[in-house]
Amino acid sequence: MSLRHSANCILIGSISLFIVIGTIVAIGASEPAQSSATPANAPAQTQQAPPASPLGARNDLPNPYLAGVSWGQFPGGRKWGSTAGIAVGPDGNIWAIDRCGAFGSRGTNCAGSPLDPVLEFDTSGKLLKSFGKGLFVSPHKITVDRDGNLWVADNGLKDGNGQQVFKFDQNGNILMTLGKAGVSGPGLDTFDQPTEVAVAPNGDIFVADGHGEQPNANARIMKFDSHGKFLKTWGKKGTGIGEFDCPHTLAFDSQGRLFVGDRQNNRIQIFDQEGRFIAEWKQFGRPSGVYIDKNDVIYVADSESREGKPGYGYNPGCRRGIRIGSAKDGSVKYFVPDPAPYGASADSTGSEGLTADFPGNIYGAEYTMDVKKYIRK
């Protein structure tokens, strides 16, 4: 899918403009935590969403996709549990993580489960392979690197397990682990609810750490070399430039710039690989998932923006859904709206993780126990 368009940001008040490498960027904003409510609890409906939020996230863009349909065929009556992780591999197959048929996140869904949480499908949804039972407490996101290796972040903690990142080959053999099993902390060899991995073209490994909501929780990016040797870290809990509040998702563009979905701050922050700040984008909504394809088409899933009172998930004027644009200049061209009402509840709905296949069809991994495929019209 080719996107040719200019940056489309609406800015108000005293929001500043940065012009960075020919890119117009909007500055500002905030995020929610996963609810323990059941999937049947939809967000409460409020008023109709406006054309755009104060931070520039548009709700009135064209939607070139058919309505999402449930996707993925399991044997033996198994059904999707909560999920936030899905990725396309170099061969076009789709990899996903499943929290072992259970509902919720950051819990102990897979601890003691006989189910495999790492799953490979073809694009029709046929299950090709699964593995990983007994390894995870609560898998969060999955990444496929350019060599086809798989990276899974486990942000659960139970009985001496969890709080690690695993690297697998496609047969499920463990090639590397990062972090200490069952240990959560701020050290250079520990994580506190790691969320996702991104692998640079040279093999350097970047881990978003972490998902914690406490004031002293980790909120940083950790960098390792291709062998797992720690190199550096940057970021802390906060709202300033280079600070994070739930760095929830990572992606690289073709220039090797690192995109960090700083979810609780309702923004994407962009850095070079040494942690130097490049830009801040708020026009894509509240980023639960970010995927960038080889043509620098960027797909951003917003599963939590809400109206109502300030607090977790508060992002007034921004409707949930998938925004699609250009990673080169930050322009947003398309919007696939979440079918849930424009609500005041912080419950997650719609895609929390996403990827796209080679023709541009989208696969959205949902906290509410499903994966949906969105086919281009």
What are these regions (language model features)?
Residues 13, 34-377:
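Eukaryotic scaffold repeat domains enriched in small/polar residues
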Residues 2-15:
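Bacterial N-terminal signal peptides that target proteins for export
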Residues 29-32:
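Bacterial lipoprotein signal-peptidase II cleavage site
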Residues 12-26:
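Bacterial N-terminal signal peptides
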Residues 6, 26-27:
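Short terminal (N- or C-terminal) low-complexity/amphipathic segments
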